Amino acid sequence: MKKILNLFVISAFLSISSAAFAQNVKPAATKPSVATLPNGASSLTETYGLWSVNCGIQDGNKICIMLRQEVNEQDRVLLSMSVSLDGEGTVSGNLTIPFGILVSKPIRLHVDDSKSVIESNVRTCVPAGCVVPIVFDKNFVGSLRAGKQLKLSMTVAAPGEPTLDNLFVQLDGFSNALKRLTSLQK
């Protein structure tokens, strides 16, 4: 009788524990979809006028930027500009400008001879130059799309604090590059 009782307790325990295990079984997690580029490529570089669009897959995420570098006669990079889009479609970027700029004064940006100006400050300096973060509003993006040059004006860190206003980023191809960047981000 005691054996039957023990057998009954053990079977009850096993049936309860197997039911408990059955309830705790989680369905196999579905893998998140991995970002892809056209034709299954792992990286992509395309040229639109003077701008390039570069994309790559990093940790399963698609990362794309637009890039333009302005060089001098010796092919040394004077300044560069990268542009990206966030999840809401906000256009932002970074300028890398030469050393010797008074970092306590803003960098002023305007397209061609427009009176619309964006000001931003140097964020940090790295071996390539000083980095200036920029966020463009929709009106300024429209000006960039239609313009010929993004002109920069800054103060030189020199006696008398002269203005340096002959640096610019050429915008030939900007509009098509931004259109492609937008389509790649989807």
UniProtKB/Swiss-Prot annotation:
Leader sequence segment: 1-22
A family per Pfam: IalB
Alphabetically ordered keywords of this record: Signal, Virulence
Against InterPro entries, the record matches this protein to: IalB_sf (IPR038696), Invasion_prot_B (IPR010642)
Q: Does the keyword Heme apply?
A: no
Answer yes or no on keyword RNA-binding: no
Role of this protein: Required with NudH/IalA for erythrocytes invasion.
Q: Which family does it belong to?
A: Belongs to the IalB family.
Identify this protein by name. Invasion protein B
**From which lineage does this chain's organism come?**
Bacteria, Pseudomonadati, Pseudomonadota, Alphaproteobacteria, Hyphomicrobiales
